[in-house]
Regions:
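Alpha-helical transmembrane segments within multi-pass membrane transporters and channels
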Residues: 1-9, 154-158, 179
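Hydrophobic/aromatic residues within transmembrane alpha-helices
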Residues: 12, 82-83, 136, 158
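Transmembrane alpha-helical segments in multi-pass inner-membrane proteins
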Residues: 99, 105, 116-178
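Start (N-cap) of specific transmembrane helices in multi-pass transporter permeases
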Residues: 90-102
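Alpha-helical transmembrane segments of multipass membrane proteins
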Residues: 15-16, 57-59, 106, 110-111, ...
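Transmembrane helix-bundle core of multi-pass membrane transporters
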Residues: 3-67, 72, 93-95, 115-124, ...
Length: 179
């Protein structure tokens, strides 16, 4: 149900964005902000954004695999009744997990907007399903209780590299949608 509610909420906010800005594109962003997400460290080619991404991956890996909260979250995903039976506050755990998920989605939205210097109501439309497919490919169960940060990262990187390779080979967009 959480996934369905999340996608429904996405549709609600996307509709709200259409009402507020219509089909316009907002692109007046400070140069420092766009440079922060598009720049790289000297001639290394390593993007500035690699640092926060690596930090978030490590932080969430530690949270999920090395804390009682994380182990409880896996238990909750596996069986809500069993998690409650062993004393896990399932409502609190869900609220924290969904809040962190929303925060990360907001940061990703800000990144995407600054990366392409355009805020539009239909930015990245359809990307949510690609991301879900990538993390499922990485071993995460949409029903909960199974998965890992590293598996998710591998799934996202695999889908990203595949998509990039197909675009480099000039595969038509109509075919890319099928892949």
């Amino acid at each position: 149900p959480a996934l369905a509610v999340t996608i429904g909420t996405l549709a609600l906010y996307r509709g709200l964005a259409l009402v507020v800005i219509g089909d316009q594109s907002i692109s007046d962003f400070p140069k420092w902000a766009t440079s922060a997400v598009t720049g790289s460290f000297g001639s290394t080619g390593i993007p500035y954004m690699a640092i926060p991404v690596i930090l978030f991956v490590v932080l969430f890996w530690l949270l999920l695999h090395k804390t009682p909260y994380g182990r409880g979250l896996f238990a909750l995903g596996y069986s809500k009744q069993a998690a409650e039976f062993v004393g896990i506050d399932t409502k609190r755990s869900r609220v924290i997990a969904l809040t962190l998920s929303g925060l990360m989605a907001a940061l990703a939205g800000i990144y995407w907007t600054l990366r392409y210097s355009a805020a539009k109501a239909d930015n990245v439309e359809g990307l949510e399903l690609v991301v879900i497919a990538a993390v499922v490919f990485g071993g995460v169960s949409v029903f909960g209780g199974r998965g890992s940060i590293w598996g998710s990262v591998c799934g996202v990187l695999t889908i990203g590299v595949l998509n990039y390779a197909l675009r480099l080979n000039r595969i038509p967009e109509v075919i890319l949608v099928l892949v």
